[in-house]
């Protein structure tokens, strides 16, 4: 019963603090009984610490016995009744934790089975073209690839490689784009620790941008982030542009060009007057992408005039930091057709696993709080789109990225071995993982002399160099300031494990006698004004200080500036102290590098990046963050053994250059240089004639064949006599004819020589001169509804059409043949539209100027623009096998569920007929299966669930609009996109952005479970408060007219 009595003592403590509380909303004393729900977020409950100790430390049997004991001693007193209820509650919480752990164990087992199956299938497909001897050699190749990774990285870091690198890059003039969206980002006086979004990542990206801007061969670096102009936020975060001054005085005087250097570019998106936490930024990502695309296009043109000989200088790479910026970088990479790089910093699957292991929240509750499934899907997309994924440690690769469907270390090694041998990978792709530790600028650091000859209590013999103010702010806490200082610097976050550190210090009397403890845990004015999580940690620490009577031995100053941090390190080194990072998991640990640079030995968690850091620097000890004794013993060993302390200090100072920013940037740029160069494929156009007023709307397409769009398609012979709808059934002969024509289109588009372009004689499509373009992107169950809306919109703006200021685009999942039949059935002509986005965004057509010869013109450059990581034949074979496996689940006499539709398929869209959508796997399951096999694609259920289109991973209807902006200069804000209340599974991509969106009530797909099987809820990505979104009361002419009037299109056009 000893354990049982211990539990009861904790429950008694809960009752002791369970009286009155403070209402955070009113600031007044509350007499309401405190809630015992652990997942409650509204108020801090001081009992949470005790409850969690009980749940994690004791068996369910002990908890049950406590409840039985409380129930058996029932009395009329309120205290005993509450004790019984508390026992019951805690017992149930413990059981819930076990239940969640069991469910997650089943999920992990299923994930393992799926990965093994996918790996076997991928290996079998790739083994078909190897001989028996080659198959045996593949194993050796895999081992070589695995064992040689570190060797290759060392070679890149060698003196010889660095000299070669400098000679190679000094003549280059690269443009690099970095993206970091959340938090408050500025170049000077960073407010690190102000909130959970403004942490180490902010400092990392700013310093990376600054360091890259100082490197030979880099002309300009843009760090793109969010412009914040909100009350309570400094005005500097609302400045559109901020130049980052170089830390290198030699390079700062060297003027490379007018626009050279590193800059923070703030893009306005989301609510204009509100600071938005990262979990709530997802609906506004498309708006950022559109704004960033405009900036990059303009900057590429400016750089072209300075260093590109008049041709645009496109980014060498677009580098996203964290999941939200990675999602943006993927879309930008696809729109620009340039390489993408990604750094995760903190990964969603790893965080989800950690939260579920704690047992306090279910998967649904975690998702509701952190929008974790949207974050995970963004990280999976980053694996699909990235050329390189940069990590800080090998643990991040082997234990964290390995959790994702899109990355398999074993399969990655196989693919790398095949590429080295020149053997086909059958359409499979895996991003390259590059371990490049973050850097630090050490030129300005002078390590402290670690002696006590001078007085650090604020009384110096000479007043020539007064002590920093922060020293006195810390020293005032100590009764004996000459003892070595144990320093911890972190946000007040539970995962930083600061409470365990205080407990370890408080319970080890020898350590308390030898050292002081300093906690730099953010800034605060009033604990009640802090966030719930931060105040919870701080109050727990204060309680522990009081419990162990640590007054005079622990410092916890309320305020510090970023500029004070070096002085804090110096003070700890001067006292011959130790720096500690006791976090449960530390992805890297930049503060460990900083501390080592100032001559401090370190003690750090054995989980994550510190293992690599201490392995390189050899300047400290690793500890188990869950073991208080391990923490106390390591600190005591370094503080008490002066010989060991001196050795660790010297090793750190000797090896610290391996973590410098120049070293990091050299490795970084070497990886960028290894990427296959990509840029927009269309030919440069004559900018001088771009604004020519002599080109009329009628002749603007006359010579379009001269700009490599001369692939024409005539469908006159395919029209059905008297047919009124493309839904009419076609006999097999007509279907075969259409398939042959469309296949011929695709083959011809690949074989055309796009270099033969007479730039001096170019004309431009009429779409360039439109002031407002209506994009009909409705996904209707009945084609008559789509035709009716098209005719209604055309009739509303019909009077303004002759001015040439208004245009139309049809964006659909239909094939070109189906579009042609649709237009014919409604009495419409291709010339009524400026462009046709077909097959869910995998094809782009324009109307031909010579309708008698051919009604449509294919933009074959769009094919090459979206071709990135398209699996081709290897993907098609896998999809056919998948369809066969799905059909095995049908009834004995039932028709096949999914059938390959070759008549509707093209080179960049593999189509499947779906006979029963309710039996077909969700699109997310198909994406998961493809990712497990390293096949990158975008799967879309469309046409009321009767068709499945599989297209390139970075192709979509929304990306096609961005392509039109990039190629023809059509402003994205000029688009007005008409959608229904629901649509295909790519529906969400059409909603956000700088374009106007009109949602037509009563129009949409009737397949209600289209979006029920999504990876994340629609409300997590729906920009409900966007000023660019309008919803009509219906779909008649008056409803649509009212919406267009609110948008301002009709009013603006009438004023022309």
UniProtKB/Swiss-Prot annotation:
Q: What is its EC number?
A: 2.4.1.14
- How does its activity get regulated? Activity is regulated by phosphorylation and moderated by concentration of metabolites and light.
In-chain residues carrying the UniProt-annotated modification Phosphoserine:
158, 424
Q: Which reaction does it catalyse?
A: beta-D-fructose 6-phosphate + UDP-alpha-D-glucose = sucrose 6(F)-phosphate + UDP + H(+)
The alphabetized UniProt keywords are:
Glycosyltransferase, Phosphoprotein, Transferase
Q: Record's SUPFAM superfamilies?
A: UDP-Glycosyltransferase/glycogen phosphorylase (SSF53756)
| Purpose of the protein | Plays a role in photosynthetic sucrose synthesis by catalyzing the rate-limiting step of sucrose biosynthesis from UDP-glucose and fructose- 6-phosphate. Involved in the regulation of carbon partitioning in the leaves of plants. May regulate the synthesis of sucrose and therefore play a major role as a limiting factor in the export of photoassimilates out of the leaf. Plays a role for sucrose availability that is essential for plant growth and fiber elongation.
Q: How does it assemble?
A: Homodimer or homotetramer.
* Name this protein carries in UniProt: Sucrose-phosphate synthase
Encoding gene, per UniProt annotation:
SPS1
């Amino acid at each position: 019963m000893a354990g049982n009595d211990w539990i009861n003592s904790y429950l008694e403590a809960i009752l002791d603090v369970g009286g009155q509380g403070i209402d955070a909303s009113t600031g007044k004393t509350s007499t309401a009984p405190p809630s015992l729900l652990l997942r409650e977020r509204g108020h801090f409950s001081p009992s949470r610490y005790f409850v969690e100790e009980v749940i994690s430390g004791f068996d369910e049997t002990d908890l049950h016995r406590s409840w039985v004991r409380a129930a058996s001693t029932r009395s009329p007193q309120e205290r005993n009744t509450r004790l019984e209820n508390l026992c019951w509650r805690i017992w149930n919480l413990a059981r819930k934790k076990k239940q969640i752990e069991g469910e997650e164990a089943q999920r992990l087992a299923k994930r393992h089975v799926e990965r093994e199956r996918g790996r076997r299938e991928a290996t079998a497909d790739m083994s078909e073209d190897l001989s028996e001897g080659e198959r045996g050699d593949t194993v050796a190749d895999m081992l070589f690839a695995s064992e040689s990774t570190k060797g290759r990285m060392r070679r890149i870091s060698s003196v010889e490689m660095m000299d070669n690198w400098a000679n190679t890059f000094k003549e280059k003039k690269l443009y690099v784009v970095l993206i970091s969206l959340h938090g408050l980002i500025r170049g000077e006086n960073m407010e690190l620790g102000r909130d959970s979004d403004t942490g180490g990542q902010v400092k990392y990206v700013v310093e990376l941008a600054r360091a890259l801007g100082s490197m030979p061969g880099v002309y300009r670096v843009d760090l793109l982030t969010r412009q914040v102009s909100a009350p309570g936020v400094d005005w500097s975060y609302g400045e559109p542009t901020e130049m980052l001054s170089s830390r290198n005085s030699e390079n700062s005087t060297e003027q490379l060009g007018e626009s050279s250097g590193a800059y923070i570019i703030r893009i306005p998106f989301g609510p204009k007057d509100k600071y938005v936490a990262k979990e709530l930024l997802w609906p506004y990502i498309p708006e950022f992408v559109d704004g960033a695309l405009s900036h990059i296009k303009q900057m590429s043109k400016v750089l072209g005039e300075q260093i590109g000989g008049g041709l645009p200088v496109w980014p060498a790479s677009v580098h996203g930091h964290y999941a939200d910026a990675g999602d943006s970088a993927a879309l930008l990479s696809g729109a620009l057709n340039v390489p993408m790089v990604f750094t995760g910093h903190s990964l969603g699957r790893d965080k989800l696993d950690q939260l579920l292991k704690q047992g306090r929240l279910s998967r649904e509750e975690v998702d509701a709080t952190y929008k974790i499934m949207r974050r995970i899907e963004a990280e999976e997309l980053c694996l699909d789109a990235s050329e390189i994924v940069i990590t800080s440690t090998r643990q991040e690769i082997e234990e964290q990225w390995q959790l994702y469907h899109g990355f398999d270390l074993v399969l990655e090694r196989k693919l790398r071995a095949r590429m080295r041998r020149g053997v086909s990978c059958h359409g499979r792709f895996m991003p390259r993982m590059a371990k490049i530790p973050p850097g630090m600028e050490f030129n300005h650091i002078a390590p402290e002399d670690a002696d006590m000859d001078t007085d650090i209590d604020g009384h110096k013999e000479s007043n020539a160099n007064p002590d920093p103010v922060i020293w006195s702010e810390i020293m005032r806490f100590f009764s004996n300031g000459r003892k070595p200082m144990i320093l911890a610097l972190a946000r007040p976050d539970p995962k930083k494990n600061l409470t365990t550190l205080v407990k370890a210090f408080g319970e080890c009397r020898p350590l308390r006698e030898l050292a002081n403890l300093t906690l730099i845990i953010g800034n605060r004015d009033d604990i009640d004004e802090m966030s719930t999580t931060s105040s919870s940690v701080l109050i727990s620490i204060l309680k522990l200080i009081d419990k162990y009577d640590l007054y005079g031995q622990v410092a916890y100053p309320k305020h510090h500036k970023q500029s004070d941090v070096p002085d804090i390190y110096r003070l700890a080194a001067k006292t011959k102290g130790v720096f500690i990072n006791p976090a449960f998991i530390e992805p890297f640990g930049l503060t460990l590098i900083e501390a080592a640079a100032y001559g401090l030995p370190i003690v750090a968690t054995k989980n994550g990046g510190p293992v690599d850091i201490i392995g390189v620097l050899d300047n400290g000890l690793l500890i188990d963050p869950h073991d208080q004794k391990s923490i106390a013993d390591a600190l005591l060993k370094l503080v008490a053994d002066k010989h060991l302390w001196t050795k660790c200090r010297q090793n750190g100072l000797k090896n610290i250059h391996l973590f410098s920013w120049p070293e990091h940037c050299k490795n970084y740029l070497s990886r960028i240089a290894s990427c296959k160069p990509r840029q927009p494929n269309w030919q440069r156009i004559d900018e001088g004639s771009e604004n020519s007023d002599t080109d009329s709307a009628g002749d603007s397409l006359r010579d379009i064949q001269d700009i490599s769009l001369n692939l024409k398609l005539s469908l006159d012979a395919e029209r059905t006599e008297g047919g009124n709808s493309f839904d009419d059934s076609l006999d097999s002969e007509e279907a075969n004819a259409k398939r042959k024509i469309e296949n011929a289109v695709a083959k011809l588009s690949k074989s055309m020589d796009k270099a033969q372009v007479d730039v001096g004689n170019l004309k431009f499509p009429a779409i360039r001169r439109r002031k407002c373009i209506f994009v009909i992107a409705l996904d209707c169950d009945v084609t008559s509804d789509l035709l009716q809306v098209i005719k209604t919109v055309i009739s509303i703006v019909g009077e303004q059409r002759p001015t040439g200021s208004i245009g139309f685009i049809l964006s659909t999942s239909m094939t070109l043949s189906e579009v042609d039949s649709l237009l014919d059935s409604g009495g419409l002509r291709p010339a009524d539209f400026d462009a046709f986005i077909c097959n869910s965004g995998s094809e782009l057509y324009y109307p031909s100027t010579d309708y008698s010869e051919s009604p449509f013109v294919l933009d074959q450059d769009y094919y090459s623009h979206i071709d990135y990581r398209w699996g081709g034949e290897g993907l098609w074979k896998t999809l056919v096998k998948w369809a066969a496996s799905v059909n095995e689940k049908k009834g004995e006499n039932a028709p096949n569920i999914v059938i390959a539709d070759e008549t509707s398929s093209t080179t960049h869209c593999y189509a499947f007929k779906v006979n029963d959508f309710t039996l077909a796997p969700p699109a997310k399951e198909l994406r998961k299966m493809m990712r497990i096999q390293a096949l990158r694609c975008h799967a879309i259920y469309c046409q009321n669930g009767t068709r499945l289109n599989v297209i390139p991973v970075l192709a979509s209807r929304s990306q096609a609009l961005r392509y039109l902006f990039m190629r023809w200069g059509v402003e994205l804000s000029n688009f007005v996109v008409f959608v229904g209340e629901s649509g295909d599974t790519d529906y969400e991509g059409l909603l956000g952005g700088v374009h106007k969106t009109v949602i037509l009530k009563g129009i949409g797909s009737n397949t209600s479970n289209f979006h029920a099987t999504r990876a994340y809820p629609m409300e997590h990505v729906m920009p409900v408060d966007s000023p660019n979104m309008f919803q009509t009361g219906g779909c008649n002419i008056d409803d649509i007219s009212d919406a267009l009037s609110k948008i301002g299109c009709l009013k603006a056009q009438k004023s022309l």
